[in-house]
């Protein structure tokens, strides 16, 4: 593996972690939102970033990329709120399946992964610069 592959690998990780933070931020921002479709209000469904290995060479060395962003298949929550305009005949309303705690933790984890990969890039750059000064 070339030392320069580290730039490609960490670069792909930076891009992917940035996209993950974006997905989690959108989930948090829309946790109380509804989508109006065909005359009906539907609760926002949490999105889950799906990552995929992104090979650089045939040596199973590579980075990561965002494969897709899928809707969370866990069921929507029902809350009793008979005064809500979207309540059913029993007084229950469907609300988003966004788990605030999990989304916050996932956003922090993506942020830390981003910082770690940035540090890897800086360390690699410093190693290359030190190598260039050998023999001077």
Curated annotation (Swiss-Prot):
<keyword id="KW-0975">Bacterial flagellum</keyword>
<dbReference type="GO" id="GO:0071978">
    <property type="term" value="P:bacterial-type flagellum-dependent swarming motility"/>
</dbReference>
<dbReference type="InterPro" id="IPR010930">
    <property type="entry name" value="Flg_bb/hook_C_dom"/>
</dbReference>
<dbReference type="GO" id="GO:0030694">
    <property type="term" value="C:bacterial-type flagellum basal body, rod"/>
</dbReference>
<dbReference type="InterPro" id="IPR006299">
    <property type="entry name" value="FlgC"/>
</dbReference>
<protein>
    <recommendedName>
        <fullName>Flagellar basal-body rod protein FlgC</fullName>
    </recommendedName>
</protein>
<comment type="subunit">
    <text>The basal body constitutes a major portion of the flagellar organelle and consists of four rings (L,P,S, and M) mounted on a central rod. The rod consists of about 26 subunits of FlgG in the distal portion, and FlgB, FlgC and FlgF are thought to build up the proximal portion of the rod with about 6 subunits each.</text>
</comment>
<dbReference type="Pfam" id="PF06429">
    <property type="entry name" value="Flg_bbr_C"/>
</dbReference>
<comment type="similarity">
    <text>Belongs to the flagella basal body rod proteins family.</text>
</comment>
